[in-house]
């Protein structure tokens, strides 16, 4: 850093360069014009700057930053203007908060002297984002800009990761500053490791008859997947990976039970049902996994970096607040080992139903789509999804091989997440094939980001599982309301009856023609497949085609996601067919 007078905008990019920021996903606007002017100036001079990726809506930019962070483990950054730019970022911020994604969201703000005057495009960004962010800052004085930016990135990526919001007044971007205030990073004491508590957990795991490890997204965030696999072998204990933990252990590992919970695998849910000890590592006990009666008849142990998660929803018998690195290092250094031959024999029997078999049909089975893509990519592609039935099928039937290849909105369940997140994931690793699995409902919520795909020549392979329904809600309507469908049919128009009960395959003609998108977005190749007989060849052709490809896959409208633990029920009431 130099002490030459410069503007806040210049300082902004000096700090981002120093922090190693590669990409800014965003959209421009009046309150961030000084930043874009400085960016353009540096680009003309061929100076080092983060590459700016112009997304077509700020929400898309926010999800792209999430996708980048989830795929790389580095902090993702989004930039937007004040007012509607900031409010459009609210959903990605909340999404990143729910799933503990290391992100920094930078917004412009009206000049400091105009705050509180109801100025044009003024919103209280700090107040709005306080409950949905890890921390937030309002920069009114350029002298605070550097330390705030450095603190924001440190907070986003440390401890339990999460989104940090930095709201920068326009006059702070324009103001000149000579010697900047010295960076002020808050003193952070390392978490003291309680060896006695760790030993108690290891002893319980070694002496349990039917132990199960529940590995969460914290394993991915900590880069502890390899350590987890060694730990699983050391204690010969089956492991279930939560939705956000998928990829932490390879599918082929004999201890792997798959995903637990409402739409979890049969072996995962059976094992959790019958376990006498559940050890949660880096994951919370959310309502989709810790269903009714979850803790009955078993001991619960919990290791997490966030003390607020201990005893939050499930009573724990043994708890340890620690980094996973410290816990695994302690475990590997210990002399403890365990064998559970009878329990593992039962696990092996249950694993024959993972993933769950499904019957053939005259219509394309979505499960088959995922299995074929898994085979075509050797289970190594970065797999991104939207939210809905397609998301669950992808989680169930793709054979994950590594961490950070599964990118999906878990805690918030944000429809429209998939396409922009896939963009960010590709920028995180352009050499890695990125496959997007989406539904026709979720895909249309951020369809404008196809313009970002073609403008940047991003070779995404996009597969829309098209059932012309908001399928997950339709499934609940069929199971819980006698098949009465209320505004879940995407083919619905003003000629339809108020209560649509019949599922008519011919209604698809009233839907948008996804094949026509190749006429709207140059460089985009579109394909369609309706017949199971042509499915494998179409998917193979799509994966082999250069550039971005969109495949419209017509699936059975009535297909449900199974297994399913109905709301308010326990694992013993899991519906399998």
Language model features with spans:
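Flexible, glycine/charged-enriched surface loops at secondary-structure junctions
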Residues: 161-164, 337-350, 550
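A short, charged, Gly/Pro-tolerant segment at domain boundaries
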Residues: 165-174, 347-352, 556-560, 567
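Short beta-strand segments
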Residues: 167, 384-386, 552
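Short glycine/proline- and acidic residue-enriched helix-loop micro-motifs
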Residues: 133-135, 184, 348-362, 497-501
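Active-site diphosphate/adenylate-binding microenvironment
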Residues: 12, 17-19, 30, 34-39, ...
């Amino acid at each position: 850093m130099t002490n030459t007078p410069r503007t806040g905008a210049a300082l902004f990019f000096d700090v981002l360069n120093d922090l190693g920021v590669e990409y800014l996903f965003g959209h421009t606007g009046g309150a961030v014009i000084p930043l874009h002017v400085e960016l353009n100036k540096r680009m003309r001079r061929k100076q080092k700057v983060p590459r700016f990726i112009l997304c077509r809506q700020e929400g898309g930019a926010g999800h792209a930053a999430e996708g980048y962070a989830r795929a790389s483990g580095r902090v993702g950054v989004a930039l937007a203007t004040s007012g509607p730019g900031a409010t459009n970022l609210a959903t990605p911020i909340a999404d990143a908060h729910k799933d503990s994604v290391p992100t920094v969201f930078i917004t412009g703000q009206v000049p400091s002297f105009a705050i509180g005057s109801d100025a044009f495009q003024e919103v209280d960004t700090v107040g709005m984002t306080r409950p949905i962010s890890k921390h937030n800052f309002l920069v009114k004085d350029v002298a605070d800009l550097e330390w705030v930016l450095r603190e924001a990135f440190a907070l986003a990526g440390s401890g339990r990761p999460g989104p940090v919001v930095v709201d920068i007044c326009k006059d702070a971007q324009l103001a000149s500053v000579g010697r900047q205030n010295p960076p002020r990073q808050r003193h952070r004491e390392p978490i003291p490791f309680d060896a006695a508590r760790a030993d108690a957990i290891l002893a319980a795991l070694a002496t349990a008859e039917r132990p199960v490890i529940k590995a969460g997204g914290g394993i991915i965030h900590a880069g502890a997947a390899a350590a987890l696999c060694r730990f699983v072998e050391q204690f010969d204990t089956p492991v279930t990976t939560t939705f956000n933990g998928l990829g932490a252990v390879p599918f082929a590992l004999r201890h792997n039970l798959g995903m637990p919970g409402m739409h979890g695998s049969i072996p995962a849910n059976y094992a959790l049902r019958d376990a006498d000890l559940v050890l949660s590592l880096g994951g919370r006990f959310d309502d989709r996994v810790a269903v009714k009666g979850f803790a009955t008849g078993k001991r619960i142990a919990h290791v997490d970096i966030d003390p607020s998660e201990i005893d939050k929803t499930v009573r724990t018998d043994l708890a340890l607040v620690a980094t996973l690195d410290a816990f695994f290092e302690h475990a590997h250094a210990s002399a403890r080992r365990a064998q559970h031959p009878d329990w593992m024999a039962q696990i092996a029997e249950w694993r024959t139903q993972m993933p769950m078999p499904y019957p053939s049909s005259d219509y394309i089975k979505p499960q088959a789509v995922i299995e074929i893509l898994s085979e075509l990519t050797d289970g190594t592609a970065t797999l991104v999804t939207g939210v809905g039935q397609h998301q669950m099928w992808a989680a169930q039937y793709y054979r994950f091989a590594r961490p950070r290849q599964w990118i999906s909105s878990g805690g918030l369940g944000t429809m429209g997440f998939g396409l922009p997140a896939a963009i960010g994931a590709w920028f995180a690793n352009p050499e890695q094939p990125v496959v997007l699995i989406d539904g026709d409902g979720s895909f249309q919520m951020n369809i404008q980001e196809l313009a970002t795909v073609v403008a940047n020549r991003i070779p995404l392979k996009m597969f829309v599982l098209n059932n012309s329904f908001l399928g997950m809600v339709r499934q609940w309507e069929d199971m819980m309301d006698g098949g009465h469908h209320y505004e879940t049919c995407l083919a619905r128009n003003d000629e339809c009856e108020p209560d649509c009960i019949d599922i008519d395959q011919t209604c698809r003609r009233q839907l948008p023609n996804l094949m026509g998108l190749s006429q709207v977005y140059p460089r985009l190749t579109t394909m369609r497949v309706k017949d199971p007989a042509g499915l494998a060849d179409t998917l193979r052709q799509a994966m082999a085609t250069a550039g971005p490809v969109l495949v419209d896959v017509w699936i059975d409208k009535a297909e449900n996601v199974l297994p399913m633990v109905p709301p308010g029920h326990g694992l013993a009431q899991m519906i399998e067919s």
